[in-house]
Amino acid sequence: SDFSLEAHMNSLFRSVTVMAVMIAALPALAEGTRRDLPMHKDLRTKFEAGIKKFNDNFEGAFAAEFIDLTDGQRVMINQDVVMATASTIKVSILVELFRQAEQKPGLLKQQRPFKSNEATGRGGMGKLLSADSAVSVEDIAKIMINLSENTATNLMIDEVGMENVNKNNVAMGLKTMKLRRKMLDTETQAAGGDNSSSTADGATLMYKIATCDLPVSKASCARIREIMEIPQPEHPAKDPIPANVPVAFKWGGLEGVSNGWGIVNLPDRPYIFIINTSYGPRDPSATVRGASQLAFDYYSRLARSTEYGSRVPAAVMAKARADKAASK
């Protein structure tokens, strides 16, 4: 296997951690929104410092990336380190399913037996459904994402093919995102075959979903996001965000690992967050929750704000931005 989390971490933490901030030229964003205002720069500097503090104080390994979908600015730390994905890898499986569904009309409505097994612990939905139950392919995918159910995930891997998921990841430019094993296959995991990705690739995938830049139709892209926005169980990466703000979300957790990936539809300031931890303590929730809270507070301050810091209704601000972009 080409995956060595420990080697990546040792290399990373032999050097000084650097906080990287990029003003990205993202084609989907209006030119008129990219001006870096002095007070915005000061707020971002404080946000960067807060994220760096979470990294410095965390006992294990921490990585994060945040993308402002209004002006394209990114705040990143340790974003190129390859880490265990846990269940966040399931987002790439969902994308590959919809890619194949466009080539196979009716696939999503087809029924499949839903059977748990020893490998997946006979838990989750397997305890609720009878042995001869059948579920539609799309519903299995929703169970995989929204309940993070391992039987559903393994059924989806069988459905679309592990190699096809990886080929599609490469085609999307996700060089480090690799599906190497089924869920709860600890023997493959121990042998170095864990599912893995850099935080940067996680951010790229979520950005592609947010902007509908996927190898699927706009309708399929919208459906992928709708599935990810179905309310999910509590998670420290999602909990700081008010319930009335839609979040396309996927969490992942293993012993030592706690991850949260999301697209937050904050009015007038939508943003993406990728928060990954590894080699973590028994309960990394405080760090994950704190980083997410810091991000939500930062983007909330920018939402609906004029360049002088006062706030106006979101619809008024949207019109002002559109008018400014049109005048360029």
Cite the ranges covered by each PLM segment.
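Structured C-terminal helix/loop/strand segments within mature extracytoplasmic catalytic/sensor domains
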Residues: 32-54, 159-161, 205-235, 244-246, ...
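Bacterial N-terminal signal peptides
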Residues: 17-25
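Mid-domain, small-residue-enriched loop/turn segments at the edges of structured enzyme/sensor domains
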Residues: 61, 133, 154-211
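Active-site SXXK
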Residues: 72, 83-112, 273
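Bacterial N-terminal signal peptides that target proteins for export
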Residues: 7-17
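Beta-lactamase-like hydrolase cores
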Residues: 31-81
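Acidic helix-start/capping segments at beta-turn-to-alpha-helix junctions
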Residues: 69-70, 108-125, 160-161, 226-227, ...
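Conserved catalytic neighborhood of penicillin-recognizing serine enzymes
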Residues: 117-154, 162
